[in-house]
Regions:
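Beta1/beta-strand and adjacent pyrophosphate-binding region of the FAD-binding site
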Residues: 1-11
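Redox-cofactor binding/interface segments in oxidoreductases and associated redox assembly factors
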Residues: 8, 148-149, 266
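Predominantly flavin-linked oxidoreductase catalytic cores and closely associated redox partners
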Residues: 108-236, 272
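FAD/FMN-dependent oxidoreductases across multiple families
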Residues: 120, 217-292, 301
Length: 354
């Protein structure tokens, strides 16, 4: 069977694209490798921007996907200056694996789903041949269009486009934890071990500590920062339940955003659509997926799709580039210290509270 569109990846970008493109009656195949043994490493917080995007589709999050506690503020810690401030934020704390499964369940049955890992994509005449490893067998599918929704490690982007965008290694550990005395969500800065940020998040009976680290010496710096943090907060981080890691993009320039051409297109983080300041990518994944699905639904001409998709995602690129400048205030120690020292935009903790 030859498909009109093959989607690689069934996260928020891929599932949204599949759901929207299915309205066009095209022949669609979506391929994803995530399962209970191969989960996507993620902090699992749904930011307000992403919540707003789901509201446009009248999508609600079932309580089974949410975990305890729900979050209304973030405790911001600078390990060098020892300054701590609190800022109001509204995140949904959730199980990321169940969240992705729920989004896949919303895809109409008319879309074929294959659980497997894409190993190769090649152009052959007027079609793309997509090789998929499923149950230790290589199966080849053909399609007129390939959409890469496979995140930072995108095989689609690596195969067809230059992948020079800056990357971090996101590393996080899970710990068994029944002590809820510390804040439920903390954001950590430590310029000596990372040029980015780290986080502490409670999820039911677990505590997650993770961060985005420069690729060079990432494991060493993770361990150094972890030791520094545990001593500062007097927090026991020795009872490790599991450790996970994945690459994450940090866009810096317009050229880091690659939307695609000639029947091979990228959405979500695979296209570079992720916040360089907070690394929130779900809202951009949904936006880019919706834009491309609407364009392909009405057009089969590669040139028209390429031109319109590039033009209609310009607003998204500008928004993310603005966050490059926001990052300067967040990650420049001098500017951040001024903001935190004077309590700009922070909320005051009541006396006697930990």
């Amino acid at each position: 069977m030859i498909y009109d569109v093959i989607i690689i990846g069934a996260g928020p970008a891929g599932s949204t694209f599949a759901r929207e493109i299915s309205k066009s009656k095209k022949k669609i195949l979506i391929i994803d490798n995530q399962n209970i043994k191969n989960k996507k490493p993620c902090g699992g917080l749904l930011a307000p921007d992403a919540q707003k995007e789901f509201a446009h589709y009248d999508i609600v999050i079932p309580k089974e996907i949410l975990v305890s506690p729900q979050i209304f503020s973030v405790k911001t810690i600078d390990l060098n200056t020892k300054i701590i401030k609190y800022y109001q934020r509204y995140y949904l704390n959730m199980d990321r694996y169940l969240f992705d499964k729920y989004l896949v369940s919303l895809i109409p049955k008319s879309v074929n789903y294959v659980c497997g890992r894409c190993t190769q994509i090649v152009k052959e005449n007027n079609y793309y041949k997509v090789s998929v490893n499923t149950d230790n067998k290589i199966i080849i599918y053909k399609s007129k269009i390939v959409v890469g929704a496979d995140g930072c490690s995108s095989i689609v982007r690596r195969t067809f486009y230059k992948d020079k965008i800056m990357k971090y290694m996101a590393i996080q550990e899970w710990y068994k934890c029944e002590d809820k005395s510390n804040s439920f969500y903390s954001c950590i800065f430590d310029k000596k071990t990372s040029s980015s940020c780290s986080w502490l998040i409670h999820k039911d009976d677990y505590l997650i500590y993770g961060g985005a680290f420069d690729l060079l010496n990432c494991n060493k710096n993770f361990a150094l920062q972890k030791d520094k943090l545990s001593k500062f907060l007097k927090l026991d981080l020795s009872n490790i339940y599991k450790k996970e890691a994945c690459l994450v993009y940090r866009p810096r320039y317009f050229c880091d955003f690659v939307t695609g051409k000639n029947g091979v297109y990228l959405i979500g983080e695979a296209a570079g659509f992720i916040s360089p300041s907070s690394f929130e990518g779900i809202s951009s994944a949904i936006k880019s997926a919706d834009v491309l699905a609407n364009i392909i639904s009405k057009n089969d001409n590669y040139k028209i799709v390429t031109r319109r998709y590039k033009r209609k995602t310009l607003f998204l690129k500008i928004k993310l580039i603005i966050k490059v400048f926001k990052r300067i205030f967040m990650y420049n120690e001098f500017l951040r210290n001024i903001i935190m020292k004077f309590g700009i935009l922070s909320i005051k903790k009541k006396k006697g509270e930990k």
